[in-house]
Curated annotation (Swiss-Prot):
Residues 1-21 form the signal peptide. One of its GO terms (biological process) is regulation of defense response to oomycetes. This is Receptor-like protein 42. InterPro entries: Leu-rich_rpt, Leu-rich_rpt_typical-subtyp, LRR_dom_sf, LRR_R13L4/SHOC2-like, RLP23-like. The keyword Methyltransferase does not apply. The chain crosses the membrane at residues 845-865. LRR repeats lie at residues 97-121, 122-143, 146-169, 170-195, 197-219, 220-244, 246-267, 268-291, 293-316, 317-339, 341-363, 364-389, 390-411, 412-436, 438-461, 462-485, 486-505, 506-527, 528-551, 553-575, 577-598, 599-623, 626-650, 700-723, 724-747, 748-771, 773-796. The gene is RLP42. Residues 866-890 are cytoplasmic. Disruption phenotype: Impaired perception of fungal endopolygalacturonases (e.g. BcPG3) leading to absence of necrosis upon B.cinerea BcPG3, BcPG2, BcPG4, and BcPG6 or A.niger AnPGB treatments. Keywords: Cell membrane, Glycoprotein, Leucine-rich repeat, Membrane, Plant defense, Receptor, Repeat, Signal, Transmembrane, Transmembrane helix.
Amino acid sequence: MSKSLLRLTFLLLLLLSCVSPSSFFTFNNPAEGPGACGPHQIQAFTQFKNEFDTRACNHSDPWNGVWCDNSTGAVTMLQLRACLSGTLKPNSSLFQFHHLRSLLLPHNNFTSSSISSKFGMLNNLEVLSLSSSGFLAQVPFSFSNLSMLSALDLSKNELTGSLSFVRNLRKLRVLDVSYNHFSGILNPNSSLFELHHLIYLNLRYNNFTSSSLPYEFGNLNKLEVLDVSSNSFFGQVPPTISNLTQLTELYLPLNDFTGSLPLVQNLTKLSILHLFGNHFSGTIPSSLFTMPFLSSIYLNKNNLSGSIEVPNSSSSSRLEHLYLGKNHLGKILEPIAKLVNLKELDLSFLNTSHPIDLSLFSSLKSLLLLDLSGDWISKASLTLDSYIPSTLEVLRLEHCDISEFPNVFKTLHNLEYIALSNNRISGKFPEWLWSLPRLSSVFITDNLLTGFEGSSEVLVNSSVQILSLDTNSLEGALPHLPLSINYFSAIDNRFGGDIPLSICNRSSLDVLDLSYNNFSGQIPPCLSNLLYLKLRKNNLEGSIPDKYYVDTPLRSFDVGYNRLTGKLPRSLINCSALQFLSVDHNGIKDTFPFYLKALPKLQVLLLSSNEFYGPLSPPNQGPLGFPELRILEIAGNKLTGSLPPDFFVNWKASSHTMNEDLGLYMVYSKVIFGNYHLTYYETIDLRYKGLSMEQENVLTSSATIDLSGNRLEGEIPESLGLLKALIALNLSNNAFTGHIPLSLANLKKIESLDLSSNQLSGTIPNGLGTLSFLAYMNVSHNQLNGEIPQGTQITGQPKSSFEGNAGLCGFPLQESCFGTNAPPAQKPKEEEEAEEDEQELNWKAVAIGYGVGVLLGLAIAQLIASYKPEWLVCLVKSRNPLRSFFGFEY
């Protein structure tokens, strides 16, 4: 836990201790004890509990319960953490507790409730926490009635708007609104700057902006913690920041600040200075290294230059964490050697003009972490004769042009984490590496290694939990994995033979990725208990094991591009956590798996290039299920039938759009040791906009559909226009008839549209010319007629996108439309009516068959997607919350 979080927790507890004399009662028994709650209060509390699902509540949690005033019996404090699931309604019994002084409801699931204005009635509140509880929309202005508040925590919700609700909250000492969507300009006259008693202010991860950090922050001179990380502030940090003489922690990272480093020399109590990821320039003042309590400096990823000077007096410095990577610093190594108390040192990507000798760090006897990635390392200092601190636990030497395995690692018996990716290391992994007693994580991807010294059992007794060996030249049989293995990835190597059955005995294995190798044989049935199984692009045969039992934890399953046959296992329906399913490019012969609609979290379904057959429309001819599905790729099968107009109405997740930075990624995160954890992201290979590309981090706020190369017929469903998150649509090479739906003009995010090789008729809707993101469009080889719309995005398409339609005319085709002076073709009546209605499509209209007889054609990109899931692995050290995002990610 970070110092700032510890401080916040301490402050909340301190404020809670100020509540009047009271008695505490458990969640289930508010009536027990000598000072029991009044009968009306008991009734209100019981009603409040009954408004929610409380099955997740930990009734043994000593902090969950009710405090009642000993003299009046009134509820004065209520804390229910991670207990409640449901909607917090304005008529909730909660608002009957008018004597509440402390209300703590963090980590509940209020299912996207808005914060009720009724909170303003609880005007005796001194402490209020609603963090991590799913609240959305704006904070009601009635919050300004809570004039007694000393602490307010609204962090980690989906709240929007400004901070106008803090007006009149003049007693506030703690304000945390981090991890929301608050926005707007922080003006000098903002109510925020009237909160002169604030000692803790956290605005992290919002979208506040200002041409510079307001000078008025300097008026909050009681502040001890100030955090404005990851907003949209730019310009220079005002000199008034030096007025905050009580400040102990200052967080300004991930903004667009410029100019010199802020003046912090007067902040003699400062212990943490975090300025990562800005555009600060100039030199680093030597005074930073003599500040009496400063223990952590994060200046990485800026534009700092020059050398640094470390006074001799710095040997007594408390500095433990120094991050200077990705700057333009010159002579810094010898001065840094004076900072003998350093525990973490980042000097990555400094572009030094001379090689770095690791022995320069020999004086740093307490060093635990060293990152020299992207630097030029002296070859001699990597030998066994070199000396570097034996205390090292984490060593990163990526992108260092190293060609031999560093023997100096032999002496590092405390080493837990090694990163040597993107070098030129060849030969075999040395046998001694796996004998390092504390080695837990090894990342040696993108090298030239060919195998392992020793027998096939060489890894078995290693302590390694995380092993990533992607993109080497490893060949032969896969060695037996460590007994402690949690994550193993060997993507893009030359391993062959059967997948060893010894993997079945690795009970802690969560993630196995053997994609892009030469494995053959069958998939071992025992792999059904993994969280992530990736076997893409091998030579595996047989059927997929039908061994998935109830509550199987599987989240991602990819066996695409193999030689698998048989049917899709019905037991997959037991995988309630499944998000990503890919069996594309195999020989699976089955009907469409409608039963998978029961999987509540399924977001990606890839079935292309198999032998799926039969109707794609559900047996009842109603809408297709899959409310969370965003990517559906079933191209190149033998699916038949027509699709009803309301086919896509249940795709709720794809009907909403969000800004890219607010999207959710296909991601898995797991603590691996101590304060370290790994994060895995999905990536996919697309043929997109006519080009092959890799999309890293599958953003599930976007949607793509590819139904091409089947035998589908009838009209294109009007309900496609509901899928506002759709960026790519491919319906080519089918037998669709009728007109292109006008509703496609509602797809404002669409980038790629392919309707080629169908039997579509009518004109191309003019509305498609207004789609500003449409970069690729193909409607060739249909029966379209009339003039091609002249919108910018359409006229930029090649002639081949419109060929094969005898009745089409206009640019970019050579055929003119009835002569240069002839009037344009008359619009169909339905298109005129749709334009009058501004082409708005709603759910009700689709459900009753909106636009009966409104048939116009459709168009989408070549999303013949060959999905190549890989893992992007980033190690993050979360000693404070910011390190969760900055620690080792560049």
